[in-house]
UniProtKB/Swiss-Prot annotation:
PANTHER family listed in its UniProt record: GLYCINE CLEAVAGE SYSTEM H PROTEIN, GLYCINE CLEAVAGE SYSTEM H PROTEIN-RELATED
Cofactor note: Binds 1 lipoyl cofactor covalently.
Gene Ontology CC entries for this record: glycine cleavage complex; mitochondrial matrix; mitochondrion
Location in the cell: Mitochondrion
Function noted in UniProt: The glycine cleavage system (glycine decarboxylase complex) catalyzes the degradation of glycine. The H protein shuttles the methylamine group of glycine from the P protein to the T protein.
Keywords assigned: Lipoyl, Mitochondrion, Phosphoprotein, Transit peptide
Protein name from the UniProt record: Putative glycine cleavage system H protein, mitochondrial
GO biological process: glycine decarboxylation via glycine cleavage system
Modified residues annotated as N6-lipoyllysine in this record: 101
Domain Lipoyl-binding: 60-142
Source organism (scientific name): Schizosaccharomyces pombe (strain 972 / ATCC 24843) (Fission yeast)
Length: 169
């Protein structure tokens, strides 16, 4: 089992303070009006302060690590995936990402049941480095408590969080 996540242990902030790339701002796509409709709210990407993301389509969320985290980790060489049909809660460990620099646990941003995993990461873990928020997704989770999404960050809030985190180091 991995000790403490690199993201939670302070490795990420110390690394990002020496490698200022503005990556977080790139990860935060422009959004439409902040007037939230139920459809928009449940179909956008949400972020955690531990640098995971979830993009919801209906009642299934696709989960991965953010571009900010992938940039800090560097070249990913191994990805530990969760078992399909596993029931998870917010904050549960659902896998790990190992790079040439460090290893980091991946935590579930939502509660539910893992419905599928990105099996292509077994042969191509570098997808997490090159396309962390598209081809490098970790798993899909059928949501059991969609209201949990309200406690996550939207694009703009996540970008601000990353900017503040960079400034504090």
């Amino acid at each position: 089992m991995l000790a403490r996540s690199a993201l939670r242990s302070g490795f990420l902030p110390s690394l990002t303070s020496s490698v200022k790339t503005g990556f977080c701002l790139k990860a935060a796509a422009p959004t439409l009006s902040m007037k939230w409709s139920a459809v928009k709210y449940y179909s956008t990407k949400h972020f955690t302060k531990e640098h995971e993301w979830v993009k919801v389509d209906g009642d299934v969320g696709t989960v991965g690590i953010t571009s900010y985290a992938a940039n800090a980790l560097g070249e990913v060489v191994f990805v530990e995936l969760p078992e399909p049909e596993t029931t998870v809660s917010v904050g549960d460990g659902i896998g790990a990402v190992e790079s040439v620099k460090s290893a980091s646990d991946v935590y579930s941003p939502v509660s539910g049941t893992v419905t599928s995993i990105n099996e292509s990461l077994g042969d191509s873990p570098d997808k997490v480095s090159s396309s962390p928020e598209e081809e490098g997704w970790i798993c899909k989770i059928k949501l059991s408590s969609p209201d949990e999404l309200k406690s996550l960050l939207n694009d703009e809030s996540y970008a601000q969080f990353c900017k503040e985190e960079d400034a504090s180091h």
